């Protein structure tokens, strides 16, 4: 009987220990779940389409949409009542800041928001000073506008070296998990793109719209001239003549134009010249907001540049 009693006590102790361990494990799981809540069902509205691609690619569990549609230009965007409804319905809004998107400032009052303009710093300004100064020789009026645009470049999604900085800021602002899978994929793409573009770093080209300044800086490309910083504003005749002379001089391989801007100026620039005219889309209008969207978008930009750099002129 003594042996049976001792065995019973031993088994009870083991059972109590197992119950205690199970309870502690359940508590730990509950605490961890509260610390890292599921992203399922959380909606994030992003002001511009290509930035929405980035956010969705980094955090696929989020419900991500864009305010300015893929085929619109943010340069002349006007809020509609339906846009106001979408803003109110979102759990958070990611935008470029009041300087670049003044039409959103009032609409976002009281709304949980992430202002990406704060990711711009003095290093960006110093890096951009050089080219802004060069454009002074082309057109005094254009220079003043371009200088401002370079110091405060709103095309944050077109800065390959700034992508991880943006993601880090969004992550901390919205208490999101680190997007490790996307960052690994992006680092691999960035390395491959640099290898592809290095042999062409001396090939000159002209851009209609100065959206790719940071891209040019990152890959050390040779952007010889830019037609305009803001396609919604008129370009001086003197500057048009100067850019056309550059296109005719043999210094450049191609002229980049954008599908959002069907400008008669483009025709004036290249008519009668043997120069490649290549479409490049900084607004990612052909890409869906999904997990693979941003890398596909960047790969398409890379494809436009390699199309310019390879083969004879038309």
Question: For the regions a protein language model found, what residue spans apply to each?
Answer:
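Extracytoplasmic metal-acquisition and chelation regions
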Residues: 2, 32-314
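N-terminal regions of proteins, emphasizing targeting and processing segments when present
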Residues: 7-8, 23, 31
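N-terminal secretory signal peptides that target proteins for export/translocation
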Residues: 1-12
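Bacterial N-terminal signal peptides
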Residues: 13-28
